Amino acid sequence: MAQLTQDCFAFGKKLIKLETALNKIKKNIKPSKIIEEINISKSLNRIVATDIIAKKNIPPHSNSAVDGYAIIYNEYKSGNRVFSIAGKSTAGHPYKQKTKKLATIKILTGAILPIGYDTVIMEEDCIIKNKSLVLPNNIKKYMNYRHLGEDIKFKNKVFFSGHKLRPQDIGVLYSLGVKKIKVYTQLKICVFSCGDELTSIDKPLKKGHIYDSNRVMLVNFLSKLSYKVQDLGILKDNKKHITKKLNNASKNNDFIITSGGMSLGDEDHIKPLIEEKGEMHVWRLAIKPGRPVGFGNYNKTPILGLPGNPAAAFVTFLMLGIPILKQISGQKLIKNNYLPIKINFEHKKKPGRKEFLRVKLSNKDNSLILKKFHKEGAGILSSTSWATGLGIIDDDIEELKEHDRINYISFSELLS
C-alpha cells in the first residue's frame, strides 16, 4: 500500500501556489515498488517496472521495402544494365539457391534479400526484355533496401522504467516477441462524495438535492487511467459516519479521493478528520477554480480532498490529482506541453492566483484560437464537456485582451 513519509508541511491562512504544492507533495510520496509480471496482451496503460532491452534486431534480416527486382549494386556500378532473372523471393519464402553473376531476383515487399544483394528497383521502373531485366542509368545503392535492425537494434533500450504503455508500444513489444512484461501493480483507489444534498442517480431527486456528478466523473477518470477503482458512494454530513467509512477505506486501498467537505463550514468534516487521523500536507491553493483542495494522509493512506463544486473538482483532479497518482504508481513524470495560443475574448482576474479557464481550441482563418465558455463558475460542469482543454492565466496577470496569448493544454494530454 502506498504510504507517505511523516514530514508535515507548514500551512496557514496564506494560499499555496500550485507549483509549490506539487513540489512539496512529490518530495513526500513514495512511488510503488510492488512489481508483477503480466501477459503483454493485458498491458495497455500499465507502467513498465524495468527497462526493456531488445533481444533481437527489428527487422531481423535485411529485406525489400517494395515489390521489384534485387541486384548486387557493384555489378550494376561496373556498367552492366542487363540481368538474368534467376528466381523469386517472397515474404516468408526466401530465395535459397546460389545465384550466378549478373542475376537478379524478383522480390516482394518484406521478403529477405539473398546474401550480397543490396539494391531493389521498383517493379514499375523495370523493363523486362527476353526474360531479362534491363535497368536505366539512375539506380542508387541501397534503393528500397531495409537494413537489418534499422527499426530496433539488438540490445538497445526500447522502453524505460516508468513508461506508460500505449497501443503502439504493445505492437513494438509484439514485434520483439515479448510475451510477458514486468509492471508496477495497479493502485487501488476508492472514491467518495460528501454532502447530505447529494443523491445517487437510482433514487428520486428531493427538493434541495442534486445528483452526485463528481463521484461518477472521478470513477470514470480513474478507470480510463487504468487504476483499480472502488466507488464507495456518498458520505453523510456526519463526523461519526465519515470516520467509520474512511477508517475502512484506509485499510483496503492505496489512495482515497473525496469531493466536498474541504472548506470550513459547520458540516465540512474531511479536513478536520485528516488532521485528527493523519496529516494535512497541503490545503487551500492559489488557483481558480479549486481553492478548497487538500492533500495529506489518513491513517498513513494518501488522501486527496477535492472541492465539491464540479468544475473545481474537475480542474483540481487534472492539475493536482493526476501528477500525484502518476508518481505514486511509478509513472515517469513528463513536463506538460503548454502551447501559447491567441484568445478571442477579454478577461479580468485578481492577481496572486492562477486561473484555469475551460476553453475550446478552434481554427479561424487557418490560425489556432481559443474560445472561452460563456460561464466561468466553479459549479458549471457543462463547461468541462464543451471545452477541449484548459487555458492557464498566470498569477501576476490581471487583464487579458483579445488576441493576447495564454498557455493551453488539452485534456487528452493531461490524461495521457
PLM ranges: what are they?
Residues 1-79, 131, 333-358:
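Short, low-complexity N-terminal leaders and the immediately following helix N-cap/first helix
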Residues 1-6, 10-18, 179-306, 310-316:
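Helix-rich terminal scaffold detector
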Residues 2-13, 55-57, 69-231, 374, ...:
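Short, glycine/charged-enriched hinge/interface segments at domain edges or termini
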Residues 13-20, 35-42, 66, 80, ...:
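Conserved active-site and cofactor/substrate-binding residues in soluble primary-metabolism enzymes
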Residues 19-22, 36-41, 50, 92, ...:
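Flexible glycine/proline-rich
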Residues 26-33, 51, 113, 156-163, ...:
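Structural signal for hydrophobic packing residues in well-ordered secondary-structure cores
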Residues 62-64, 77-78, 96-100, 113-115, ...:
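Solvent-exposed alpha-helices and their adjacent loops that cap or buttress functional pockets
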